[in-house]
Amino acid sequence: MTHSTARRMALRGLTVAALASSSLLSVAHADTPAVLRVSAIPDEAPTELQRKFKPLGEYLSQATGMKVVFTPVSDYAAVVESLATKKLDLAWLGGFTYVQAKIRTHGTAIPIVQRAEDAVFTSQFITADPNIRTLADLKGKTFAFGAPSSTSGSLMPRYFLLKDGLNPEKDFKTVAYSGAHDATVAFVAAGKAEAGVLNTSVWDKLVESKKVDTSKVRVFATTPPYFDYNWTVRGDLDPAIIKKLTDAFLALDPAKPEHKAIMDLQRASKFIPTKSSNYDGTETAAKSAGLLK
């Protein structure tokens, strides 16, 4: 072997080593999975969540070039934990579950987009009791929240009740947790609770689909607006994938029939960028309610 040949081989080896090292560094700083793993807080029945996500999942698969797999979970905490332990790449979270995910991931979870509606979200207090007309009438009544970790079915309504001088545990006869927004309506309709609270989006959907008899169950109060749902990614996901996902959501246009079908299922007029600081008020409310230290 001549000196020049040996030198060329050595240089080639150094180049390969450098490329391999560069590749390993990239992997260390950004995870690029072959499959995009997605889930959502179970604020509705699992079958309904899967039905709503299917067209969106197909759209995101086209946008990212990745296989998209949606896996329903049993409770809110499971979504937060799965995001923190890197078993999920993208998750549909409520405002409070985002705050929990931020804390659990030491600030690395990134909220990327929300529906325009989520920037001015509200909850509806409902009843089938003709004697309940105002929040003050809830004293001594049985009441149902949604899931304990639900932003719109528990945390924010509780926060506004406390601001109005009503402490659910002290002022209501009993407090129950239905587990989901649609279940809260069922509780009130069946007389399991004299009143309850759920988010406006689910209430409107149930009314439009005639799954609630508004001659029996009605809204008697509405909360002030607050930030709620968002799509959040784990912080060490490949930035290129995060950008593709963000761009895909922001590109959804209701003027395009194929996009409108997706957006209607998501109950979104459009998607807008969001940021962690939008949920500072939610974190404050959670601390005020004793749900966070």
Kindly give the residue locations of the regions a language model identified.
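Acidic, polar ligand-binding/catalytic clefts
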Residues: E81-D137
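An extracytoplasmic/periplasmic, membrane-proximal ligand-sensing/linker region
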Residues: P33-S39, E44-S61, Y226-D228, T232-K293
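Twin-arginine (Tat) signal peptide motif
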Residues: M1-A17, S21-L25
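Hinge/capping helix and adjacent helix->loop/strand transition within the periplasmic-binding protein
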Residues: I126-T142, D236-K243, D247, A251
